[in-house]
């Protein structure tokens, strides 16, 4: 009789595992009630904001936007279209496709979570099968071999449902890694600009980085390049002398008016990284999308703003994390149920 009751109890516990924690995203810590005295209304509102940022994957959902080895604002990085130092941009990813036995760089990407890389949707126009892709993370030399560099297969590619290839509207995509990457001094996520009320202007310190061509008719490089750029007003970018009104509200321009610093072919999908002094962190304020040529006067690079896609991005982050938790809990439940049957058989 006792064994029978034990079996029923185990069945109850097993079934409860199917649903427990289902609504708690992976990698987040649920905050219980504080043992401190009742907080003021201002303190309560601050807590609510922090919790909301955690749920939505905001600026401080995890430590992000800092490079352990370098500090760009102290002049330790080479700026101006030259070689980036190792560890300078630990969130920059090389997205590669295998041709024969060789992996070839196709597009850039940005590590925003331990299993998520942000990139441009048009990078996948000729290769939408995730099995074709590999993410190379934690290197400035894509031909080098280093213990801190990781090569991870892609589990899924998620393209924005309203992406239009002809106009590059909604040119945003997510690569879901097959396994979580472990952070180190050379691999760190950048912050997403959610709940960050910062208007970009010409004084905001922003940087581009990638393995693309160093000039319009030149060759790609195996050494990561970087340069400082600045935001260019929508009025100037959409003027008749520039893009003539084709830049949508979800995109913007950055570079410089003379075209001295710009992204080029092979840099697509990589980040526009801006340092926000209020947070003392870097944020991915743009995704490299397209441009008219490379480095042409009056035609700066065009970037997609991730902040316009907060709902779409967070839905995928949350869905993937809860799906993983549910799978684990179902497995636990199945194991416990199997154990119950073993106990029942042993008592008959």
From Swiss-Prot:
Subcellular location: Cell membrane; Cytoplasmic vesicle, Secretory vesicle, Acrosome
Keyword 4Fe-4S: no
Membrane topology of this protein: Single-pass membrane protein
Name of the protein in its database record: Transmembrane protease serine 12
Its EC number(s): 3.4.21.-
Residues in compartment: Cytoplasmic: 346-348
Disulfide bridge positions per record: 107-123, 206-274, 237-253, 264-294
Annotated transmembrane regions: 325-345
Function comment: Required for male fertility. Plays a critical role in sperm capacitation and acrosome reactions during fertilization, and also plays a role in the regulation of proteins involved in spermatogenesis. Regulates protein pathways that promote chromosomal synapsis formation, double-strand break repair, formation of the inner mitochondrial membrane cristae and apoptosis in developing sperm. Required for normal sperm motility and binding to the zona pellucida, potentially via a role in ADAM3 protein maturation.
């Amino acid at each position: 009789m006792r064994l029978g009751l034990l079996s029923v109890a185990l069945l109850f516990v097993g079934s409860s595992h199917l649903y427990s924690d289902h609504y708690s995203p992976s990698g987040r810590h649920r905050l219980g009630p504080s043992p401190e005295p009742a907080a003021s209304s201002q303190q309560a509102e601050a807590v609510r904001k922090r919790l909301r940022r955690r749920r939505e994957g905001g600026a401080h959902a995890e430590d992000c936007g800092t490079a352990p080895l370098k500090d760009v604002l102290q002049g330790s990085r080479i700026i101006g279209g030259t070689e980036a130092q190792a560890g300078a941009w630990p969130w920059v990813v090389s997205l590669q496709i295998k041709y024969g036995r060789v992996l070839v760089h196709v597009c850039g990407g940005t590590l925003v979570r331990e299993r998520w890389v942000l990139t441009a949707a048009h990078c996948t126009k000729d290769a939408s099968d995730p099995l074709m892709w590999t993410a190379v993370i934690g290197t400035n030399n894509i031909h080098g071999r280093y213990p801190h560099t990781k090569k991870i297969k892609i589990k899924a590619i998620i393209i924005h449902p309203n992406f239009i290839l002809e106009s590059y509207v909604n040119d945003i995509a997510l690569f879901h890694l097959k396994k979580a990457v472990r952070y180190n001094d050379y691999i760190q996520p950048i912050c997403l600009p959610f709940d960050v009320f910062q208007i970009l202007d010409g004084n905001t310190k922003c940087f581009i980085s990638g393995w693309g061509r160093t000039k319009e008719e030149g060759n790609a490089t195996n050494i990561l390049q970087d340069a400082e750029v600045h935001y260019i007003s929508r009025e100037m970018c959409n003027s008749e002398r520039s893009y003539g009104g084709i830049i949508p509200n979800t995109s913007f321009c950055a570079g410089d008016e003379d075209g001295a610093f710009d992204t080029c072919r092979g840099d697509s999908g990589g980040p526009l990284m801006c340092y926000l002094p209020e947070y003392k962190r870097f944020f991915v304020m743009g995704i490299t999308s397209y441009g008219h040529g490379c480095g042409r006067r009056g035609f700066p690079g065009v970037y997609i703003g991730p902040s316009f896609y907060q709902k779409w991005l967070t839905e995928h982050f949350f869905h993937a994390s809860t799906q993983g938790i549910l799978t684990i809990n179902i497995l636990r439940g199945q194991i416990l149920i199997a154990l119950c049957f073993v106990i029942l058989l042993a008592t008959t």
